[in-house]
Amino acid sequence: MTILFLTMVISYFGCMKAAPMKEANVRGQGSLAYPGVRTHGTLESVNGPKAGSRGLTSSSSSSLADTFEHVIEELLDEDQKVRPNEENNKDADMYTSRVMLSSQVPLEPPLLFLLEEYKNYLDAANMSMRVRRHSDPARRGELSVCDSISEWVTAADKKTAVDMSGGTVTVLEKVPVSKGQLKQYFYETKCNPMGYTKEGCRGIDKRHWNSQCRTTQSYVRALTMDSKKRIGWRFIRIDTSCVCTLTIKRGR
């Protein structure tokens, strides 16, 4: 599982170029790093300049695994520091990592999504086999109340969005960096129009409740242009989840 996760992380970074949003200067190879997430060395800096041509031996693979696990721990710690206390801040969803600047379509979900899954895997590894079987949703026959789909979309798909002041802004498709331009990608989650819950939420007693699966939105930071042609980074709303809404049926 560790090697599989490392392969996913390597492929994730391989399709992405980084560049800091906090500074005007672009460092390194023009990659975009988000606040709270540190940039780390390449595989060459971990295993030496010729590691890629030699291939990974068992010792280098173990060293690489240890290095990535250390990076994962740092990223999770930083995410907890950047993410505000959700109980005291209603705008906590603004800090989700659903935006990426890349030269091509990302091959994986956002990195922090993968980190959370890997963290859950590590937690599950400490359970007994019997507890793991009992906690596995698939073994318990669990189903989602609403069917949803998640995918990367570009500014060409979105075109416009609503910012925090309620105004409509134009989402810029490309972001200039020192060595060219990168596209903005947004990881959106919405209700599946082709799913089995388009007529109502799953598992709801239709005799007493009216139910509907609805797409909800959260704020993410993106490069936009307002009606006065002013370009800047603003928080905009994108689709981030599919939830079930209920209304009680009135007696006839």
From Swiss-Prot:
The Swiss-Prot or TrEMBL record annotates one GO molecular function as: growth factor activity
Give the positions of the site Cleavage: 57-58
Processing and modification events after translation? Mature BDNF is produced by proteolytic removal of the propeptide, catalyzed by a FURIN family member. In addition, the precursor form is proteolytically cleaved within the propeptide, but this is not an obligatory intermediate for the production of mature BDNF. Can be converted into mature BDNF by plasmin (PLG).
- Note the SS bond partners: 146-213, 191-242, 201-244
**Location(s) in or outside the cell:** Secreted
The GO annotation for biological process reads:
cell surface receptor protein tyrosine kinase signaling pathway; modulation of chemical synaptic transmission; negative regulation of neuron apoptotic process; nerve development; nerve growth factor signaling pathway; neuron projection morphogenesis
What are the alphabetically sorted keywords of the record? Cleavage on pair of basic residues, Disulfide bond, Glycoprotein, Growth factor, Secreted, Signal
* Region of interest: Disordered: 43-62
Signal peptide segment: 1-18
Tissues with expression? Brain and central nervous system.
Its cellular-component GO annotations read: axon; cytoplasm; dendrite; extracellular space; perinuclear region of cytoplasm; synaptic vesicle
Q: Which residues have a glycan attached per UniProt?
A: 126
* Coiled-coil zones: none
Q: Does the keyword Signal apply?
A: yes
Report residue numbers covered by any propeptide: 19-133
User: What exactly does this protein do?
Assistant: Important signaling molecule that activates signaling cascades downstream of NTRK2. During development, promotes the survival and differentiation of selected neuronal populations of the peripheral and central nervous systems. Participates in axonal growth, pathfinding and in the modulation of dendritic growth and morphology. Major regulator of synaptic transmission and plasticity at adult synapses in many regions of the CNS.
Family membership: Belongs to the NGF-beta family.
* Assembly notes: Monomers and homodimers. Binds to NTRK2/TRKB. Can form heterodimers with other neurotrophin family members, such as NTF3 and NTF4 (in vitro), but the physiological relevance of this is not clear. BDNF precursor form: interacts with the heterodimer formed by NGFR and SORCS2. Mature BDNF has much lower affinity for the heterodimer formed by NGFR and SORCS2.
The name of this protein is Neurotrophic factor BDNF precursor form
Give the organism, scientific name: Sus scrofa (Pig)
